[in-house]
Amino acid sequence: GDIDALLDLEARSFETDRLTRRNFQYLLTRAHAACLLAEDAQGNLLGYVLALFRRGTSLARIYSLAVSAKARGQGIGQALLLAAERTAIEEHAWLMRLEVRPDNQSAIRLYEAAGYRPFGRYLDYYEDHSEAVRYQKRLRPDVVPPETRVPYYSQTTDFTCGPAALMMAMKALTPETELG
């Protein structure tokens, strides 16, 4: 029922990188995620947003957001985005991130109007090799991110960076640690 409606909306909304039945089943049952739906009075699916949460971090991610063509322009995308942000705050996230195609101007307008700001790009991100613009928004302006400065320590072996990474982490946590 619901997965069929989600798959139908997915097929009508995206030309590439569509979620499959297996993707939806995993995300709805096993992942640390929330799938929020917008429906009309008859129970027809108008849109959905899929948000992912990472245990042990303050990051959340909009994985997918789609609104049916007939329901666009009615504020449904904005309402879904706001609902995902509220859910992320309940999950103790204070930063929401997402990726969007640079040619998806309607989505970019939605995200920028909601306070999302670009902070980077992924090259060759989508199936068709187009890039993605990365956006983020601080959901909790009252939460100040930790100022952890990690000093650089050059790798001393040619086979792994593990020891150097461990040294940098130790120095960041205990500044009096001597590197070298």
Describe each model-derived feature in a short phrase.
Residues 67, 101-102:
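Short amphipathic helical patch at the helix-1/turn junction of helix-turn-helix
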Residues 22, 97-100, 112, 117-134:
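Conserved catalytic-core motifs of GNAT/GCN5-like acyltransferases
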Residues 3-72, 78-83, 87, 91, ...:
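Acetyl-CoA-dependent GNAT
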Residues 142-180:
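Active-site-adjacent structural segments surrounding the nucleophilic cysteine of cysteine proteases
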Residues 81, 104-107, 124-129:
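Short glycine/proline-centered loop/turn elements that form peptide/ligand docking sites
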Residues 5, 109-110:
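Well-formed, non-transmembrane alpha-helical positions, independent of function
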